[in-house]
Curated annotation (Swiss-Prot):
This is Non-motile and phage-resistance protein. It is a multi-pass membrane protein. The chain crosses the membrane at residues 29-50, 283-303, 343-363. Residues 318-389 form the PAS domain. It catalyses: ATP + protein L-histidine = ADP + protein N-phospho-L-histidine. Residues 607-830 form the Histidine kinase domain. GO terms for cellular component: plasma membrane. It is found in: Cell membrane. The gene is pleC. Member of the two-component regulatory system involved in the regulation of polar organelle development. PleC functions as a membrane-associated protein kinase that transfers phosphate to the response regulator PleD, leading to its activation. The modification Phosphohistidine is found at H610. Keywords: ATP-binding, Cell cycle, Cell membrane, Differentiation, Kinase, Membrane, Nucleotide-binding, Phosphoprotein, Transferase, Transmembrane, Transmembrane helix, Two-component regulatory system.
Length: 842
C-alpha cells in the first residue's frame, strides 16, 4: 500500500463514539467533587447539588454499558448477515451462469454461511425449487413475497410467528425473477443477558423476532416487553426509560442494524436514587448533616466513576468479541471516504490485500492492489454506491511480492450518512474472502461438465429427477428416443408433465420378461423397442435409462419364426419319410443300372476299338505300300493320290480309335500310368519333332522355349500325348504364316513345386462363352474355319483327363482373332495322395 499508516487509532464508527463518552466520565466526577466540597457548608446548595446530580443521572439512564451491549448485539447481527449475504451472492452468480444448478446454489450458500444459516432455499415464481439444510417448517414462499414487495436486491426480515430471521437476495432463473433465501434462528443472535437484564431483536414496526432475559419471554412487540413504541425510542444513541411487564423501570438502548431493517435492543433495570433523594431533602435544611451529605455524595460519585470504568472495560471486551466474531467469519470491515479518497481497513481486510494489518490508505493505493482487469468494475461500483447507496462487487487480488497468495474478494457495502448533492460521501461495508468458494465452484462446474459429457456420450437415453420430481438433467438420446421438444425439457420441469409428452411416443409397454423390478419394455410408434430401467438415488431422486433393444426383439421374432418353420419342417420330414425311403430305393436301383450301362458301354467301345484296329492296320499298311510304289509304279498318277487319301484317312481313323480306346479306359478306370523320373525337355522335343513336318507343310513357325527345368515324376507316354494333342490343335486352327510356341517355367506352390507348360498359337481364337464346353467329350466349337478340319472333340477331353490323373490343372485363355494359349501344370514330385484342382477356363 502506497501510504500504509499502520493500524488505525480510531474509525468513524458508533462504537468509537461510545468509547469516547466512557473515557470522559472520570473527569466529570472530579469536577463534581470539587464543586460539592466548596458548597458543603450550605445545606441549601447541597440539596440543589444533589438534585442536579439526580437530573443528570436521569438524563443518561443506563450509561455506556447498556449502549455497548446494544452495539454488541448489532455487531453480532451484522457479522451474521455479512456471512449469509456472501453465500447468497455466490449462489445468485451461480444461478445466472447455470439456471439448472439450483441445488448446488443452495448448498454453496449453506457452506459459505459457515453455520450462520440453518437452511437455504431457491424460490422462483412457480414455488420452491431447491432446499438445503434443516428446513424445520420455514415459510419460504412468504419470505419470497416479502423480499419481492420490499423492492430491494438484498432483503432481511421475518415473516409469521416462527421467530426466524430470513436473508434474501434477488436473482433470475430462466429469465424470471427468483430469490435465494437463507433462514436461521434469530434467538442465536441475542446473547444470554446478565441477571436482571434482557436483549431483543425487533423489526422496524416494533415486532419482536427474538428476545431473552427478564420479563420478555413470550412478548410479541416492544410495547409488550418494554412499554415503548418506535416513536418513544427516537433516533439518537441515548437510552430511554421503559417499564417491564412486572412494573419495574428499565433503561432501554436501541441500535439500528442492516440499514434500519432490524433493531438491536438492550435493557437493564434503572438504578434508583429515590432513597438518596429522600435523605438529602430531609436533611437539606439541617446544618448538622451537610458534611455527611457531601461525603455520601462524594462516595456516590466515586461509585458512578467506578461503574463507568467497568462499563468502559465491558465495551472494550464487547468490541474485542465483535472483532473475533468478524474474523471467525473471515469477514473484513472497511470504510471508504469518497471525498478524501481515504479507506479505513480492519486487520482482516488489510491482510486480504497483502498488508500485515489494518489501517488507513488512499483509494488509489487500494486499487493498485486489485487485478488490473477488475479495477474498472470497482470504480463503477463505487460510483453506483455514491448515487444509489448499494455497493456489491467481486474482484481478484493478485499474489504480492511479499508472498501473499492470490485471493478472490466479495465486497459489499452501503452508503453511510445522509446523501448530499453528489450522493453519499462514505461507503461502509464488509469484505469476504471467497477464494475457496470460487475454487469449489470451479471444481464443481468441471465435475458437472465431465458428468454431462459422460451422460451425453452413452448410447442409452438418460434422465435424472430430484426427490420432488423435478428435472435435473437429460441427454440428447432421451430427447431423440421420446421425440421431445427442448422447451419441454427445461431444468425444473415436472416429471408428470414430461412423462405425459413422452407417453405419446410409446405404442405399448409391459413389464420385462424376467420380472426385474423397475424394468419394463416398450414398443415405440416408429417400430423400435426400448428397455426402460428406473431406480432411486441415495438423495431420493430418480434415474431412468432407456436402451434400444430393437435388434434383440428382431432376433427373438426371427428365432420364433425359425422355430415354427423348423417344427413345420420336422413334421413335413416325418410325413415324407416313407416317400424318401422309396425314392432312395429307386435311386439305388437306377444307380446300379446306370453303372452297369456305363461299364457295358466302356467295354463295348474298348472291344470295338480293338476289333476296328485289326483290319485298319492292314488298310494303312497296304495304302502306304501303294503310296510309296514299293512294288513298282501304279500307272496313272491318280492312283497314287488315291492311295495317299486312303493312308491319311486310315491314320486319322486309327488316331480316333486310339482316343476312343483311351477315353474308355479312363472312364472304366483301367488306364494305368507309369510314373518315372524324366526330363520334360525330352518329351517336348519328341512331340515337336513329330508335328514339325505338319507345321512346315501348313506354313507355320514352330518354336520351343524351355529353361533349365528339374526332373519330374510323370508318365512319359501320357505327357507326350498331351503335348501332341495341344500342338495338333494349335497347328490345325492356325492360319498360314502364323506361329506356335511351347514354353515352360517353374511355379512355387504351398503343396509343392510345379512346372507350367503353355502352348500358344496365333490362330482364330475361341469365344469366351465356348471355352467351358471344350474339355467335354465329343464337344466341338463350330466356326467357318473348323468346318474344313476333322476331329471328334475327344482330344481336349482326353488331355484334361490325363493331366488330372497327374494331379495337374488345365487352363485356357483365348481371344477371338488373336489366338489361344492352353497351359497345364504338373507337380515336380508325384504323390499317391491326390490333390483336387478344378479345370479353369478363361
Amino acid at each position: 500500500m502506497g501510504r500504509h499508516g499502520g493500524p488505525a487509532a480510531a474509525g468513524p464508527t458508533a462504537p468509537s463514539a461510545v468509547r469516547a463518552k466512557a473515557v470522559n466520565a472520570p473527569s466529570q466526577v472530579f469536577v463534581r467533587i470539587a464543586i460539592l466540597a466548596a458548597l458543603l457548608l450550605l445545606a441549601v446548595y447541597t440539596a440543589f447539588g444533589v438534585h442536579r446530580l439526580q437530573r443528570e443521572a436521569m438524563a443518561q439512564p443506563g450509561g455506556a454499558p447498556l449502549a455497548a451491549k446494544a452495539d454488541l448485539i448489532a455487531g453480532r447481527v451484522d457479522a451474521n448477515l455479512a456471512a449469509q449475504r456472501a453465500g447468497l451472492s455466490a449462489a445468485a452468480d451461480l444461478l445466472k451462469r447455470d439456471p439448472g444448478a439450483t441445488m448446488d446454489a443452495a448448498e454453496t450458500t449453506l457452506r459459505a454461511a459457515g453455520g450462520e444459516a440453518a437452511a437455504v432455499a431457491v424460490v422462483s415464481e412457480a414455488g420452491v425449487v431447491a432446499v438445503a439444510g434443516r428446513d424445520d417448517g420455514a415459510d419460504w414462499k412468504a419470505a419470497a413475497l416479502a423480499a419481492g414487495a420490499s423492492g430491494r436486491t438484498n432483503w432481511v426480515g421475518s415473516v409469521g410467528e416462527t421467530g426466524r430471521l430470513y436473508v434474501a437476495t434477488t436473482t433470475s432463473l430462466d429469465r424470471a425473477r427468483a430469490f435465494v433465501i437463507a433462514s436461521g434462528d434469530a434467538s442465536r443472535l441475542v446473547a444470554d443477558p446478565e441477571k436482571g437484564e434482557s436483549g431483543a431483536l425487533a423489526l422496524p414496526d416494533g415486532k419482536l423476532i427474538a428476545a431473552r432475559g427478564r420479563g420478555v419471554q413470550g412478548a410479541g412487540a416492544l410495547r409488550e416487553a418494554f412499554a415503548l413504541s418506535i416513536e418513544d425510542l427516537g433516533d439518537g444513541p441515548a437510552a430511554v426509560r421503559g417499564q417491564a411487564a412486572d412494573g419495574a423501570l428499565l433503561d432501554v438502548a436501541v441500535r439500528p442494524v442492516a440499514q434500519g431493517a432490524l433493531l438491536a435492543v438492550a435493557a437493564a433495570p434503572t438504578r434508583s436514587v429515590a432513597n438518596l433523594d429522600r435523605q438529602v431533602m430531609e436533611g437539606a435544611f439541617s446544618l448538622l448533616v451537610p458534611l455527611g451529605v457531601g461525603i455520601a455524595l462524594a462516595l456516590l460519585l466515586m461509585i458512578q466513576s467506578r461503574k463507568a470504568e467497568v462499563a468502559h472495560r465491558e465495551f472494550i471486551d464487547s468490541e474485542r468479541r465483535f472483532r473475533l466474531a468478524v474474523e471467525a467469519a473471515r469477514c473484513g470491515i472497511w470504510e471508504w471516504d469518497l471525498n478524501g479518497d481515504q479507506v479505513y481497513l480492519s486487520d482482516v481486510t488489510g491482510a486480504m490485500f497483502g498488508w500485515g494489518g489494518g489501517g488507513v490508505v488512499s483509494g488509489q493505493d487500494l486499487l493498485e492492489r486489485i487485478s488490473i482487469d477488475h479495477r474498472e468494475r470497482v470504480r463503477q461500483a463505487l460510483a453506483n454506491a455514491a448515487m444509489y447507496g448499494a455497493f456489491d462487487v467481486s474482484f481478484r487480488v493478485p499474489a504480492s511480492e511479499q508472498g501473499a497468495r492470490s485471493l478472490w474478494i466479495d465486497a459489499r457495502g452501503q452508503g453511510f450518512g445522509k446523501p448530499g448533492s453528489e450522493g453519499h460521501a462514505r461507503i461502509i461495508g464488509v469484505a469476504l474472502d471467497v477464494t475457496e468458494e470460487r475454487i469449489a465452484q470451479a471444481r464443481a462446474q468441471a465435475a458437472e461438465n465431465r458428468l454431462r459429457d459422460a451422460i451425453e456420450s452413452v448410447s442409452e437415453a438418460f434422465v435424472l429427477w430430484d426427490r420432488q420430481g423435478r428435472l435435473l438433467m437429460c441427454n440428447r438420446n432421451y430427447r431423440s428416443v421420446f421425440s421431445l421438444e427442448p422447451k419441454i425439457l427445461k431444468p425444473g420441469a415436472a416429471r408428470a408433465e414430461v412423462n405425459r409428452f413422452a407417453a405419446l411416443a410409446i405404442k405399448q409397454d409391459h413389464p420385462a420378461p424376467d420380472g426385474a423390478k423397475g424394468v419394463r419394455e416398450a414398443e415405440m410408434m416408429d417400430g423400435r423397442w426400448i428397455q426402460i430401467s428406473e431406480r432411486r438415488t441415495a438423495e431420493g431422486g430418480l434415474v431412468m435409462t432407456a436402451a434400444d433393444i430393437t435388434a434383440i426383439k428382431t432376433q427373438e421374432e426371427a428365432r420364433r419364426r425359425n422355430e415354427e418353420q423348423l417344427q413345420n419342417a420336422v413334421a413335413g420330414l416325418e410325413r415324407s419319410q416313407e416317400q424318401l425311403a422309396e425314392l432312395a430305393r429307386k435311386y439305388e436301383t437306377e444307380k446300379v443300372k446306370a453303372e452297369s450301362a456305363n461299364k457295358a458301354k466302356s467295354e463295348f467301345l474298348a472291344n470295338m476299338s480293338h476289333e476296328l484296329r485289326t483290319p485298319l492296320n492292314a488298310i494303312n499298311g497296304f495304302s502306304e505300300i501303294m503310296m510309296n510304289e514299293m512294288f513298282g509304279p501304279l500307272g496313272d498318277q491318280r492312283y497314287k493320290g488315291y492311295s495317299q487319301d486312303i493312308h491319311s484317312s486310315g491314320q486319322h481313323l486309327l488316331a480316333l480309335i486310339n482316343d476312343i480306346l483311351d477315353m474308355s479306359k479312363i472312364e472304366a478306370g483301367k488306364m494305368n500310368l507309369k510314373f518315372e523320373s524324366m526330363h520334360l525337355e525330352d518329351v517336348a522335343e519328341d512331340a515337336v519333332r513329330l508335328v514339325r513336318n505338319r507345321a512346315e507343310a501348313a506354313g507355320l513357325k514352330l518354336d520351343i522355349d524351355f529353361p533349365q527345368l528339374p526332373e519330374i515324376e510323370a508318365d512319359y507316354r501320357a505327357v507326350k500325348q498331351v503335348l501332341l494333342n495341344l500342338l495338333s490343335n494349335a497347328i490345325k486352327f492356325t492360319p498360314r504364316a502364323g506361329s506356335v510356341t511351347v514354353r515352360a517355367e517353374v511355379r512355387r506352390d504351398p503343396f509343392g513345386d510345379l512346372i507350367k507348360v503353355s502352348v500358344t498359337d496365333t490362330g482364330i481364337g475361341i469365344a469366351k462363352e465356348d471355352l467351358a464346353r471344350l474339355a467335354k467329350p465329343f464337344e466341338q466349337v463350330e466356326s467357318q474355319f473348323s468346318k474344313t478340319t476333322q476331329g471328334t472333340g475327344l482330344g481336349l477331353a482326353l488331355t484334361k483327363s490325363l493331366i488330372t490323373m497327374h494331379d495337374g490343372v488345365l487352363e485356357m485363355h483365348s481371344t477371338p482373332g488373336e489366338g489361344t494359349t492352353v497351359s497345364f501344370t504338373l507337380p515336380v514330385r508325384h504323390s499317391d495322395q491326390k490333390i483336387t484342382r478344378d479345370f479353369v477356363a478363361a
